[in-house]
């Protein structure tokens, strides 16, 4: 697996190179966002590890530009700022995950593994689309529709909706969703799940459709026609 690591701090770049290479990844480095976009266009990696604060073009703008072209390259954002607003900004820009600095190597590796797992095709996936009410999801073609309206989802949004639609009317705990969709236990203070539920609600209700994804306070979420 090829990882492109992008950071304007040479020491951080070299640390990422050593750590990732030691764990079996092929690693390429970029100094800033402009160079990163050029390298992705020239030879697309399997995942992107991206710092936020960089000269010329920051990490969030790199995310936006890639997503605006429909590129679903797995992106892990590294940020020295760990406020809720900063994390939400990263997810809004199109990042699949975020990791505050300083970080433990074990957590970096776990998050990269989780990202790469979500990109692998499921050979055993059912070819028949799943549906609930007027919402349909095809795990093979990765097409999603609400009635006759097609819905474009990011990789993480799709994984979350797929879990919900595979468990209709079942209350799924927050911890179970985080473990299955993100591939590891998120800190309880993290709000990535809430952010992505918000994204899914906006997209599945964009034409005024009724809400299907409901919050079960203190527990998690459920896909059902009416509030619990």
From Swiss-Prot:
DNA-binding interval(s): 127-225
UniProt keyword Phosphoprotein present: yes
4-aspartylphosphate modified-residue sites: 46
Pfam family for this entry, one: Trans_reg_C
Origin superkingdom: Bacteria
Tagged with keyword Phosphoprotein: yes
Record GO terms (molecular function): phosphorelay response regulator activity; transcription cis-regulatory region binding
Ranges where the Response regulatory domain occurs: 2-116
Subcellular location(s) per record: Cytoplasm
Physiological role: Member of the two-component regulatory system MprB/MprA which contributes to maintaining a balance among several systems involved in stress resistance and is required for establishment and maintenance of persistent infection in the host. Functions as a transcriptional regulator that recognizes a 19-bp nucleotide motif comprizing two loosely conserved 8-bp direct DNA-binding motif repeats separated by a 3-bp spacer region.
Protein name: Response regulator MprA
Species annotation: Mycobacterium leprae (strain TN)
């Amino acid at each position: 697996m090829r990882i492109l690591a992008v950071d304007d701090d040479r020491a951080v770049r070299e640390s990422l190179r050593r750590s990732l290479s030691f764990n079996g990844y092929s690693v390429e480095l970029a100094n800033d966002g402009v160079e990163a976009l050029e390298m992705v266009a020239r030879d697309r990696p399997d995942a992107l590890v991206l710092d936020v604060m960089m000269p010329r073009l920051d990490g969030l703008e790199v995310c936006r530009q890639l997503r605006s072209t429909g590129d679903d390259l797995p992106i892990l954002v590294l940020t020295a700022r760990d406020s809720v607003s900063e994390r939400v900004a990263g997810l809004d820009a199109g990042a699949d995950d975020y990791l505050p600095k300083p970080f433990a190597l074990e957590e970096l590796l776990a998050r990269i593994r989780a990202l790469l797992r979500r990109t692998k095709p499921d050979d055993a996936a059912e070819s028949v689309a799943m549906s609930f009410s007027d919402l349909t999801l095809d795990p093979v073609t990765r097409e999603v529709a609400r009635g006759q309206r097609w819905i474009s989802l990011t990789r993480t949004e799709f994984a979350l909706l797929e879990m919900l639609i595979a468990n209709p009317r079942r209350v799924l705990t927050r911890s179970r969703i985080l473990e299955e969709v993100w591939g590891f236990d998120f800190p309880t203070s993290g709000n990535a799940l809430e952010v992505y539920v918000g994204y899914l609600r906006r997209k599945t209700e964009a034409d005024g459709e009724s809400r299907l994804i409901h919050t079960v306070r203190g527990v998690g979420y459920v896909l059902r026609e009416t509030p619990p």
